[in-house]
Amino acid sequence: MKKELLKILREKKPLVHHITNVVTVNDCANITLAIGALPVMAHALEEVEEMVSAADALVLNIGTLTNEQVEAMIKAGKAANRFKVPVILDPVGAGATKLRTQSSKKILEEVKISVIKGNSAEISILAGKGGKIRGVESQGGVDDIAEAAKDLANAYNVVVAMSGATDIITDGKRIAYVKNGHPMMGTITGTGCMLTSVVASFCGVCEDYFETTIEAFVAFGIAGERAAQSSNVKGPGSFKVTFFDEIYNLTPEIIEKDKKVEV
């Protein structure tokens, strides 16, 4: 991994355009700021093209989707492709309903995505391998989830990042396993959405999206580990606050020392 990615990110302060869900929008904005990037939340059909033209990365998160929002996502995504802005798709709950599955596939067909970030069930559904979803949380997936991730990466020429106890990141050829993180991260809503924002922040400063996605997952996981070990943490509420602080206080040296990656 490139050791100075976090330093570059904080020097450049990439603008990350989000079209995201109403549940976690504030957390996504704040985590983007904490890692060192600049968030903008703009979803109106009339302005998304103009906004993405000024951005360094685009997040498309279907957590609370509507048909109008999907239209705005596709419009923004096509503009991002024209302006060579990386597009990060978070297909929240793909497989839970037909609308979510079909919308995710429609975006993938009409927009050149740079990174797809999801859990094992979401990724396996989009790879055509089956999977089981309850609500928007993964309840399981295919036996060989790494192969499902590689198949999806090759199908759309995209980096696939699958979050789990061990995160799997692949571009269809290379594959990395990230083992940073802590179970406390699952006790608060929105960690997946926030991770997507961090991925986009890193992708906004380097075009090797495989490497930048690994760096984002490692940084995010390390912050979770450090927050969980803090004496200030008494439960999910204090964990969340401390987690933001740990994201903010990350350094390239901390990432290099604490990373747990197999490539």
Swiss-Prot record:
It catalyses: 5-(2-hydroxyethyl)-4-methylthiazole + ATP = 4-methyl-5-(2-phosphooxyethyl)-thiazole + ADP + H(+). ATP binds at K117, S163. GO terms for biological process: thiamine biosynthetic process; thiamine diphosphate biosynthetic process. Its cofactor is Mg(2+). The keyword Secreted does not apply. Pfam families: HK. Keywords: ATP-binding, Kinase, Magnesium, Metal-binding, Nucleotide-binding, Thiamine biosynthesis, Transferase. It is an enzyme of class 2 (transferase). Its EC number is 2.7.1.50. Pathway: Cofactor biosynthesis; thiamine diphosphate biosynthesis; 4-methyl-5-(2-phosphoethyl)-thiazole from 5-(2-hydroxyethyl)-4-methylthiazole: step 1/1. InterPro entries: Hyethyz_kinase, Ribokinase-like. GO terms for molecular function: ATP binding; hydroxyethylthiazole kinase activity; magnesium ion binding. Substrate binds at M41, G190. HAMAP family: Thz_kinase. Catalyzes the phosphorylation of the hydroxyl group of 4-methyl-5-beta-hydroxyethylthiazole (THZ). Belongs to the Thz kinase family. This is Hydroxyethylthiazole kinase. It comes from Thermoanaerobacter sp. (strain X514).
